[in-house]
Amino acid sequence: VANVIAQTRKNTLVISHNKTLAAQLYSELKQFFPKNNVGYFVSYYDYYQPESYLPQTDTYIEKDTQINEKIEKMRLEATAMLLSGEPTIIVATVSCIYSLGSPGEWEKMAITVTAGQNVERSELIKKLISARYERNDVEMAPGNFRVRGDTIDIIPAYSEDMIRISLFGDEVEKISILDHISLSEKGKTNLIKIFPAKHYLVASDVRQKAVKSIKKELKDRLTQLNELEKQRLEMRTKFDLEMIEELGYCSGIENYSRHFDGRKAGEKAFCLLDFFGDDFLLVIDESHVTLPQLHGMYAGDHTRKKSLIDYGFRLPSAFDNRPLKFEEFEQYIRNCIFVSATPSDYERKKSFHIAEQLVRPTGLLDPVVEVRPTKNQMDDLISEISKRTKNGERTLVTTLTKRMAEDLAEYLAKKDVRVRYLHSEIEGLQRTELIRQLRLGDFDVLVGINLLREGLDIPEVSLVAILDADKEGFLRNNTSLIQTFGRASRNVHGTAILYADTITKSIKSALEETERRRNKQIEYNKTHKITPKTIIKSIPEQVATLDDIKNKSPHDLNKESIEVEAQMKKYAVDLDFEKAIECRDRLRRIQVEMEKKNER
């Protein structure tokens, strides 16, 4: 993919289905393109509780968020890169299809300063404030500026460098780029373009038109509501309008974005994809997972907004602050690469060329796959587990239900097998710790359900056993089976055993595909004289354990909550979202336990 990007020389958007994978792709592309713009665009919320209303219980839930300032800066940096005119690669999650504001308006609000330009100091300050920069003559941070005599220092919201504009009277004498900590000069420039500090903002003339449009919609809507909803909507909207007229923005201003953008009811909002223009390359990573996510975003958002609008918390125009519908997203698919080990029918139908990348540089083959009858399957499974355990290897066993996973784990434990089970109700921190303990050899077998598919990278696993493999369905279709086989493909002794009494179409297809891939790799290994070797991968350090929370005193819990929260923020800043999520889950458990102890 990196070679395609280099050869096409197009601006490129890479979409991944979660923050962790996006961060990995971002890091890799930064290494591949050290001299190019590589940006990162994901949701900037460490915590997000959307505004909603539950009519059954008459419960209004206010929007509650915790914004990661580092990621907000990177989002602004990504859009600034795209409007800079330089070749740019952006790695994003499905956040890229959510409303972002007009790229035209955002660029219109940018401040261009050139050496020798005539501009009054007060005018420049006014423009910075309009672009949502905050004056702070004491402490400088991204998004701040300060004024000292005829010198204006600015740290763009998307940069670590400081811009110093030196004036002589009403003329720009010099533009310098400084290190914002040491204030040492890094260079000079004759032209600088400073993009706004926020994505949601509009020029004053557009704001006036939008206010009129919002007032008109409010007037029309009030005639359709009963007294309670009418009073609620009128009070809320008028307060927002006052804030917009006085300050240029309000809390939840994105819900009025249709009026600011000049869009018609139902018309799609602007999003990150609009910053790319017409000619760009789109790469959808793990497309068999990412595309269904893109499909589902609109429906969930619409359902939540409907209650808010029906009961007078929002104007109907709030519907139009939304993610793209999938058919709208498809309009951006012009030059696209779908990347997937198991592409669905959609990708196959859309693609005019399918390029297979089957060979691994490590020489590792897809696992040997065997189908065995269900009769005496438990005895057979225990025998196979024993063989792996003697060799210091691990086993994954996948069942169809949570109850089956728990019962199987209990049965194996009675047979002196060191086993644990894993399912969706186990929190993120516990999941990661279980996998870590499996790799360390604290136990030998992990029993799970669908969690044994994408992203479980355990080189120590040499056996994957699939129970009820002939039960056709989502967890036993061709795609799922191949993904599950893949959990044993990191080990040179990788084997997958399917316990089934019938060879279903899915099993037959998965066996044929796996054999085809094995043959390709074997041929490649012979040609290049490669001897397959098990992947060597470091085992991460333990973040925290869960079992000790209930035994701690309130004082110790309070102390730990402070430490875990600090750890969570550090991981988030470092873009290690997997560990940040683990810390968040532990923090919530600590807080629940503290509340229980305080009630006693």
Set out the residue ranges of the language-model regions:
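Charged, solvent-exposed alpha-helical segments that act as regulatory interaction surfaces
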Residues: 246, 548, 593-596
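C-terminal tails and terminal domains of large nucleic-acid-associated
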Residues: 561-597
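ASCE RecA-like P-loop NTPase motor cores
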Residues: 1-540, 544, 553, 557, ...
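Long, amphipathic alpha-helical segments that form or neighbor coiled-coils/leucine zippers used
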Residues: 547-550, 565
